[in-house]
Amino acid sequence: MALRRIYGTETEYGIVHRGVKDSNPISASSFLINAYLSTTSDQGVGPNAPRVGWDFIDETPEIDIRGFAPIGSLPPEIEANLVNAVLTNGSRYYVDHAHPELSTPECLDPLSLLRWDRAGDEIIVKSMKAANEVLPPGEEIIVYKNNSDGKGNSYGCHENYLISREIPFGRIVQHATTHFVTRQIFTGAGKVGSEAVGEKRMETPFQLTQRADFFEEEVGLETTLKRPIINTRDEPHADPLKYR
């Protein structure tokens, strides 16, 4: 019998605030999300809805799947001053550093996940419309579903997998890396030019994937420096004796 799996995605979107002298992506992201929340009549998500509390006490994102943790690693600190909303469809809509991010609800099959992912895109479109209706003349917020901004900054769509601890980690790396790299032939978003360190932008006419320029390691724990193809964060959100 096949194991039933839970699916979900987290998508970071690119954002730009046009028509202002000093564009701040954090402020723009907060404005975008609040504009959407102010237009919805759904109970519990409007402008006067109570904030959702997040308990990170049991989370240890610095524990490495290879069996160690950096000295002094602590549960993450939530940036309580940033917008953080749970929508009525179960999605989480929030500001993550300098991006609007939308996480789907937990789904029980790939088709449901695809539907909720597309619903997230529609929420972004409605958010842009709501934000631009109240901005001063000459200003505009635009959101992009991309993976790099053309200036050396990268962000993306995260995939998280719950796997049995009985499976040797080396076996996972062997097979998963091959899949993650070769699937770009079919699913890569593509981009013109290069953002890799030491390369001239237009010496690379076209790439199949927007994010390849930013990967430096095959395996690792970092998410913003020395980005790996496979991240080794050991945070199962399940029985840690059985899963990772």
Predicted stretch roles:
Residues 1-144, 174-191, 200-202, 213, ...:
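Terminal catalytic/cofactor-binding subdomain
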Residues 168-170:
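A short alpha->loop->secondary-structure connector
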Residues 149-150, 212-214:
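Acidic, glycine-rich active-site loops and adjacent beta-strand->loop/helix elements
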Residues 164, 193-195:
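Hydrophobic, small-residue-rich alpha-helical packing segments that form membrane-like cores
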Residues 147-164:
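Histidine-centered divalent-metal-coordination microenvironment in nucleic-acid enzymes
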